[in-house]
Amino acid sequence: MSDLLGILKQQGQSEEFDAIKIALASPELIRSWSYGEVKKPETINYRTFKPERDGLFCAKTFGPVKDYECLCGKYKRLKHRGVICEKCGVELALAKVRRERMGHIELASPVAHIWFLKSLPSRIGLLLDMTLRDIERVLYFEAFVVVDPGMTELERGQLLNDEAYLDAMEQYGDEFDARMGAEAIRDLLRQIDLEDEIRNLREELPTTNSETKIKKITKRLKLLEAFYESGNKPEWMIMDVLPVLPPDLRPLVPLDGGRFATSDLNDLYRRVINRNNRLKRLLDLNAPDIIVRNEKRMLQESVDALLDNGRRGRAITGTNKRPLKSLADMIKGKQGRFRQNLLGKRVDYSGRSVIVVGPTLKLHQCGLPKKMALELFKPFIFSKLEFRGLATTIKAAKKMVEREESVVWDILDDVIREHPILLNRAPTLHRLGIQAFEPVLIEGKAIQLHPLVCTAYNADFDGDQMAVHVPLTLEAQLEARSLMMSTNNILSPASGEPIIVPSQDVVLGLYYLTREKVNALGEGKIYSSAQEAQNFYEAGHLDIHAKIKIRMPKEDGETGYHLVETTVGRAILAEILPKGMPFDYINRTMTKKVISKVIDSCYRKFGLKETVIFADQLMYTGFKYATRSGASIGIEDMEIPDDKSSIIEHADNEVREIESQFRSGLVTNGERYNKVIDIWSRTNELVAKSMMSKIATEEVTDAKGNKVRQESFNPIFMMADSGARGSAAQIRQLAGMRGLMAAPDGSIIETPITANFREGLNVFQYFISTHGARKGLADTALKTANSGYLTRRLVDVAQDVVITEDDCGTDTGILMQPLIEGGDIVEPLHERVLGRVVASDVYIPTQTEPVVKAGTLLDEEWVEKLEKHGVDQVMVRSPITCQTRFGLCAKCYGRDLARGHLVNTGEAVGIIAAQSIGEPGTQLTMRTFHIGGAASRATAANNIQIKTKGVIRLHNIKTVTHENKNLVAVSRSGEVTIVDEFGRERERYKVPYGAVISAQDNSPVEAGQVIATWDPHTHPVISEVSGRLKFVDLIDGITMNRQTDELTGLSNIVIIDAKQRSAAGRDLRPMVKLVTDEGDDIYLAGTNVPAQYYLPVDAIVNFEDGSLVGIGDVIARIPQERSKTRDITGGLPRVADLFEARKPKDSAVMAEVSGLVNFGKETKGKRRLIINVSEDQCHEELIPKWRHISVFEGEHVERGEIIAEGALNPHDILRLLGVGALANYIVNEVQDVYRLQGVKINDKHIEVIVRQMLRKRVITFAGDSKFLVGEQVEESAMLQENDKLLAEGKQIARGTPILLGITKASLATESFISAASFQETTRVLTEAAVSGKVDELRGLKENVMVGRLIPAGTGYTYHQSRKAKRARAAAGGDSSATHTVTASDVEHALSEALNADNHEH
């Protein structure tokens, strides 16, 4: 009996483990793994196909080829299990032991492990403090190294070439020991006393001053400590014994025709064995030194190739000239072990087929072809047949199924009932790419999909395929039904808006149904109920668009009835409204946006079930009336506006005017270009406006016979207006003008396409169009790949963020304000704070009690309240400020967007964040070419026109008053706000330098008033005092050119680029200063700073030397570069740059301290800018001369203010302005890109990623901790160490947050398994092995790879209970520590989790 149990045990689960450790293997360990030495390079006997003895496939070493059968055939059958055959020496066991038994090769000479030698920084090099180059010379037998100097003057580790060695031999004889090859290196490593070295280095650190030295010592110290603490011995990096992989992991497969297909590893092993055997023979024969050396070098090279082919020298190639795949190649890359087999596996019980539309399905159903169902549910059918006694054995059942007997189909129906299946469409970019449905059996071979889930899957029916998976166990079916069912995923986890929203035909149908028509059949009649109106319509007495009145029950809890004005179509729609839903929700024209809102409110008001039923009904109705409407596209429907030709003619004249100005030298080429582009952009808008007004309305006769205009029933207009398909931009190309096009480099071609598609393009226009079209296709291919890679990096960095506790107890958060851009409120406050938890009480000026208490979760009702009270800023909890050590707390995260209540513990919010940001990335990549590259460039803003009545307030604007009484702004970061009578901010605008402000501070303004204007194409230099202009260093032909125009004789002074000046003008600094008539300097008001203005390259001076200049005059202007088109091409890389925290090229220079600015002595090519904080403290900044410095002498700057313009550097923001400002910057920048494409993502997803980028701290003060100053450590590690130190009453370590890009952050994660499977596998594993790292299996990825439930979602409770058991076992020596979890346990945990999930609904 015990034998039998033994077998079962073998088959069962391997023992449980809680962590995985990786370390260097000692030679003894390698020998203990081995089942025997591999002595011969032979593989199998090609005649008998039996493995050769002592060869690479030896049955004696690795186990039998067939189950329980020895090689010579003496013993067969299970009864001899465990016997070792005396003839062939094979132990009788299962053949699968050939997958786990290892062998070994005893090397005749030690060999260095290439990973520890060549993986930078070289570990062997660091330990010995030798350069990689030197070590390689020793290893590959080019030089001797002194191992033991004895009493000589030589030093340990000194290299000697042949001559030096011979000299030394002559001089000292046998006094010293110098050798070459790996043994020398091994002996050197052996001699290292780790404790001693560590002590010496720690003493040396404080005494050194040189940066490079400190860096080097720190690196070395870290490595030595890693070795010391992990118990690895340095000499183990040199191998005496080479392990041999089990043969079934490097198989040899016979092909037909007597040839064999083999794994490359066999070739590599054969090489090693051949060379090793030859070396042994040479050593036995006492061959000459030089031959032995060569053989040893070749052995070293062959072992290198086996471990990591191509890492050193040329890769060893096989028969067909391709490099052989070494052990390292086996595990790294997309095809490697990690990503191919551990993180992604193929699964059984699955099938795939093409999808077709299933307009009659309910939302929770999908149509499954009978053939597929029969195959997928086979085991269930077999057991049912047996259970019912229709088949005696499984074999008989199999026959019945193959014959497809009628009873089988009945049983299939039975099996399938209420058994959910999973549908997946690749690429699965977010969690809605896999959803569960109940199958409905259908004829045919295509899967039927419900149209409303297409948005989530991003599916269409042009040949897409989908995969079907069957959840087998009860738990899996339960999870599929309660969490993954399509009806449970109505809201998008990215934005919290409905994702089950009708689109395309359905929208068109509902739109058509709810439109009004003037003077339609039956207009003005009154009916007693919607039903009655419907009857009359069906009898043909009413038009569907007729305006009628219907008697309806009152809403808002009132009793009785009232008459409602509506149309017949809306009355039909009212029939499907959920009970209690106000009729005025749908008593309007239904566009896509309206429908989405209705579904959203339905979900919030009535919950899930009603919403699902309602969505389905909407869909059926939409399809029905889209068919009835008969909408189609015809050439006639593209109506070209009558005044198009005159508008274009007018634009042509304007362009001609500008061209002539350019020829007269009044404007530069850059300005001309910008102005031409602006004219054409504006013209395009005008044509579009005129076209839209023509297409959008039509003239009809009303009941009284008067002519009136109504919204038109033009099908093209209806499609765009309803949001079903197409946009105004596309209609503009069909019937307006195509407009400006972008050239391949992204610049705008200044000749627009004036034709549209209905008129047709001429050859030239067609040709310009092809640029955009082709670029679109090329971009799409490239960017899909880029976007996928971005998603992968995001998932990797955020994978272990799980909600682990309810409340971390922090009272900090981030301040939320409405997002204002160019004066428009892009995102109002109530949208931004919805679903967040308030961090501190919210007050309003008129009350002493808080409106909202801290700790409140803001739902729809609360944000309405905030809106009503006009609150314009709220401090909310954020993932960035959450204090939880591992993971996040529910309060800091807030609402689970896909469920609409506070997030549950165990929710994998990191993955969801990564998917939410990555998924639209892939959508965006597809977007560019839809408009065929039509340049979408906003006309440059040149004024501020306000939208609401109020009072104007100027904020930190420095102004001077021009002689015409207008204010001119002479500061950079100024803003104006408009406040209403309650003092609430309504609008906010940035005011650029040089803007003319036509309203005074605190003066009342009206809506529509223009309060500031400026020239968008140039940067002006404004004079702040009046006086005479004096040129300094402006020398004609050296630092400036006079560009005179032949036609007009006007001349402009233009500053020459320093790089193009002659030697004389190289160091001159052109500037203008204002002086009195006597020539004395004039100072800026209230300072001792002279009024002087440095002129940058290309500046155009407006005045001559000595002319009079008034306050606020423009002395010079600097032309701005032409603008490139903004489309998402800038978008995706921009998002990647932000998340990678890359330092932008020519980044803005920010003030390190607050103080007064003045300019110091210049150096070659740079200017010295000094900020004086106080009398004795100042900060210097060197800025290249070509940079545009945006502050003037004597100006006061705040810490973190921009001194020289450029893109902001996130690292600077973090250093100077703190975590809050950085979070704001990254969130807003990322959102800008997505907003441009009309994609909604909730801020918290970006915040979760930012949190992960800020995980590390740089140690600024080490205290009594084990850290070194300047070391980067995980915040959690620092806090844990500090807890320990506090408990012992020692000094704690302090550190400042540091920003890491997502790739760096992923690689710097605590888990080496996760990092190795992400990128740079070799480096990660080398590092982990040296320091003997332990992976606690905290994240999701690690657990997937070891084949466990992930510690998130329903698996979270499982992991928690295991943790608790471990703790109990550790405390009380509990014997049931390794208790296995039973199915009922999991089921119990699951139902608990699901109850927690459902108790809000």
Swiss-Prot record:
InterPro entries: DNA-dir_RpoC_beta_prime, DNA-dir_RpoC_beta_prime_bact, RNA_pol_asu, RNA_pol_N, RNA_pol_Rpb1_1, RNA_pol_Rpb1_3, RNA_pol_Rpb1_3_sf, RNA_pol_Rpb1_4
Cofactor: Mg(2+); Zn(2+)
Enzyme class of the recorded protein, top EC level: transferase
Example of a GO biological process term: DNA-templated transcription
HAMAP family in the cross-refs: RNApol_bact_RpoC
PANTHER family: DNA-DIRECTED RNA POLYMERASE, DNA-DIRECTED RNA POLYMERASE SUBUNIT BETA
Name by which UniProt lists this protein: DNA-directed RNA polymerase subunit beta'
Source species: Legionella pneumophila (strain Paris)
